[in-house]
Amino acid sequence: GILLLVLFLMSLVLFAPDLLGDPDNYTPANPLNTPPHIKPEWYFLFAYAILRSIPNKLGGVLALVSSILILILMPLLHTSKQRSMMFRPFSQCLFWILVADLLTLTWIGGQPVEYPFIIIGQLASVLYFFIILVLMPITSTIENNLLKW
């Protein structure tokens, strides 16, 4: 049984390699346009949405790189004296807003580049950077003052 299966698969691969091929493999390439069926993996869709939200190519690439490198700055931006978020309700709320924003960016990254998705992606991208760079340190400082640390 195994030999028949191997014989069938080898004859398929060696004698008719294009039989199961994708027809998109034979269309001429356009280096200025990404085909609509090409999408990154689901865990990079948020960064892909940030890349597409900026019309300038260099700006989009810089935003893409900074959206991933900004995660390196997280320990420096965490200015709270208390490690846990149990007694920090503002930080809890901000965390869930960031999670919702990342889910929105992930959803937008999988959508086509059309009118409502472009605007939603731009707003979600601005909110992503605004939460991490501005709101997180301000919220931590306010909560430090409220807890008298």
Swiss-Prot record:
CDD domains: cytochrome_b_C. Its cofactor is heme. Component of the ubiquinol-cytochrome c reductase complex (complex III or cytochrome b-c1 complex) that is part of the mitochondrial respiratory chain. The b-c1 complex mediates electron transfer from ubiquinol to cytochrome c. Contributes to the generation of a proton gradient across the mitochondrial membrane that is then used for ATP synthesis. The chain crosses the membrane at residues 1-16, 58-78, 90-110, 117-137. It comes from Cervus nippon nippon. Heme 1 (or BL or b562) is low-potential and absorbs at about 562 nm, and heme 2 (or BH or b566) is high-potential and absorbs at about 566 nm. The keyword Chloroplast does not apply. One of its GO terms (molecular function) is ubiquinol-cytochrome-c reductase activity. Gene3D superfamilies: Cytochrome Bc1 Complex, Chain C. This is Cytochrome b. It is found in: Mitochondrion inner membrane. InterPro entries: Cyt_b/b6_C, Cyt_b/b6_C_sf, Cytb/b6-like_sf, Cytochrome_b_C_euk/bac. Binds 2 heme groups non-covalently. GO terms for biological process: mitochondrial electron transport, ubiquinol to cytochrome c. Keywords: Electron transport, Heme, Iron, Membrane, Metal-binding, Mitochondrion, Mitochondrion inner membrane, Respiratory chain, Transmembrane, Transmembrane helix, Transport, Ubiquinone. GO terms for cellular component: mitochondrial inner membrane. It comes from the Eukaryota. It is a multi-pass membrane protein. Pfam families: Cytochrom_B_C. The keyword Mitochondrion applies.
